[in-house]
Amino acid sequence: MRVGVLTGGGDCPGLNAVIRAVVRKGIEVHGWDFVGFRNGWNGPLTGDSRPLGLNDVEDILTRGGTILRSSRTNPYKVEGGVDKIKQVLADQGVDALIAIGGEDTLGVAKRLTDDGIGVVGVPKTIDNDLGATDYTFGFDTAVSIATEAIDRLHTTAESHHRALVVEVMGRHAGWIALHSGLAGGASVILVPERHFNVDQVVSWVERRFEKEFAPIIVVAEGALPEGGEEKLLTGEKDAFGHVRLGGIGTWLADEIAHRTGKESRAVVLGHVQRGGTPTAYDRVLATRFGLNAVDAVADGDFGVMVALKGTDIVRVKLSEATAELKTVPVERYQEAEVFFG
């Protein structure tokens, strides 16, 4: 059997650990051949590929990013895209695909399965917002990076007695903001799931100043003020219809400065949350996902995604994997509110 592997969507720490586990088990246990398709779905669309052997994955466990590179290519936006993929797979003798990605990549995987291509999905997103799995790799690393940044920002904020607004990733789900804010001792945490009242935020900030402390406000990029709109870096959309969010941190810092008369600055962590070495947790989770994806291919169980349920790796239908996002529930946010102000 010959199996194709690809990584789609935004990169995150742990992708290489999945690739390594897939190739190691596929070759050493089953004797399969592997081909890596470059740049997400663009690889099987155009035939851009490379062989994947044991030597190719020998030293990639701890590396961030992906040796296969990635893109946000949507083959269903390309005329004749599905037929092109089928032809490339036939030409290269590929019997099945393992697609590693988030909601968009897995949504394509589901549609390709419906169109007769054997695909197994592996969930990937630093946002941790896929509803069919308890956790996705990359999330723990992103939270660790954001928490370290918050820890460092506390000292500079206190030295100058200023407010610092830390903008983290999170388009529709505020898991990174919630976890890093709690771990980093933030004075306020703002998430997309709950539109915030600016007056209330200012009140929490002023209360912190009154206690002679410098407030740290952690805000997800998709957070919204009541009656407000998303802050966009650009109105352009990618192949899946997503706009680039950004700017809520700067906007909020300006509002705080204007309303309190106190110096306030914004810090946008941006893509640093995606980069670098994955944590031990993410390496292990990514490895387990890869091993179990190989099992699904061996069983001929296509149209599924491997997922974490409790401490077990299970399989769920791709239709279930992309059905809904996992957002921060009210009770989890209320836990964090105890520490506001």
Curated annotation (Swiss-Prot):
Which reaction does this chain catalyze?
A: beta-D-fructose 6-phosphate + diphosphate = beta-D-fructose 1,6-bisphosphate + phosphate + H(+)
Its Enzyme Commission number? Answer: 2.7.1.90
A cellular component annotation (GO) from this entry:
6-phosphofructokinase complex
Q: Which UniProt keywords apply?
A: Cytoplasm, Glycolysis, Kinase, Magnesium, Metal-binding, Transferase
Q: Name its co-factor(s).
A: Mg(2+)
Q: Which Pfam families match?
A: PFK (PF00365)
MF terms in GO: 6-phosphofructokinase activity; AMP binding; ATP binding; diphosphate-fructose-6-phosphate 1-phosphotransferase activity; fructose-6-phosphate binding; identical protein binding; metal ion binding; monosaccharide binding
Notes on activation and inhibition:
Non-allosteric.
Residues that, per the record, bind substrate: 125-127, 162, 169-171, 221, 265, 271-274
Q: What is its main location?
A: cytoplasm
Q: Which GO terms describe its biological process?
A: canonical glycolysis; fructose 1,6-bisphosphate metabolic process; fructose 6-phosphate metabolic process
Matches recorded under SUPFAM superfamilies: Phosphofructokinase
Q: What class of enzyme is it?
A: transferase
Localization: Cytoplasm
Role of this protein:
Catalyzes the phosphorylation of D-fructose 6-phosphate, the first committing step of glycolysis. Uses inorganic phosphate (PPi) as phosphoryl donor instead of ATP like common ATP-dependent phosphofructokinases (ATP-PFKs), which renders the reaction reversible, and can thus function both in glycolysis and gluconeogenesis. Consistently, PPi-PFK can replace the enzymes of both the forward (ATP-PFK) and reverse (fructose-bisphosphatase (FBPase)) reactions.
Q: Which HAMAP family match?
A: Phosphofructokinase_III
Q: What is this protein called?
A: Pyrophosphate--fructose 6-phosphate 1-phosphotransferase
Q: What is the lineage of its organism?
A: Bacteria, Bacillati, Actinomycetota, Actinomycetes, Pseudonocardiales
